[in-house]
Amino acid sequence: LLHSNSITYWDYIHTDALLGLQIQRTNLPDEMVFIAYHQINELIFKMILWEIKQVAEGESLKVDVFQDKLMRISRYFDMLTTSFNIMREGMDVAQYNKFRHTLTPASGFQSAQYRKIEFASTELINLIDIRFRANIDRDTPFEHAFEHLYWQAAGKDHKTGEKSLLLLGFEKKYKDEFLRYMEEYNTINIWQKFKQLPDADQKDRELVNAMRHYDYTVNVTWVMGHLNAARKYIDSGKGSGEATGGSDWKKYMLPKYQKRIFFPELWTKEEIDNWGENL
């Protein structure tokens, strides 16, 4: 209180502005659930990026600080995973299949913050579509690597190279920003910061477990929570079977297809081979 003027809760949180951002495109009541839920996700993504930034920019990080940041991030993803019940049980399927058509080609696929979380977590090679990894390395130009990221499969016909409106709009808005971000975090992503620790710290069992927990939470637990929520609506038999935006959602989302693993060196061959299986 000695360092600030008095302020009200609503001014500090900007409640009026925050609560004025949920703008529906239809008069279907459950669209409000869909909008607010995704906005909450974006706020949590912002908090995750805030923690990652502190790791990336930290000098001479101690094991306990590194571990604390990882567990903070993991708890955010744990919360996001359990919150999928809000989506899965909180919307009427018939309403969803009506208002979803007003969203095209918008999609949660187009969350720029989530892409940044991925770029800031791991080596770029681990985000490349598994079909193209053999021909890409650290010397590959960022733009070429960008064209072969795993999520391009959700919006591109790799036989013709033609991109969907979903992907074209996303790239028009964010591609330049992504390329700068990819380059910035190339040497300060979470994996690089881990490898910069002293050897003894890299072998710290609690830190390794925190790294593994974060990896599995993001790339399997959270993804499957998202997939299971999507299945209820997309595979309900009451709609077209396409995701919002028309993405190839099964190939894009199922962990076993793309083997998205942030820290493969921390997993055994058997664990990697069975990644995303038997869930």
Regions found by a protein language model. Name each.
Residues 1-279:
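Surface-exposed peri-terminal alpha-helical interaction modules
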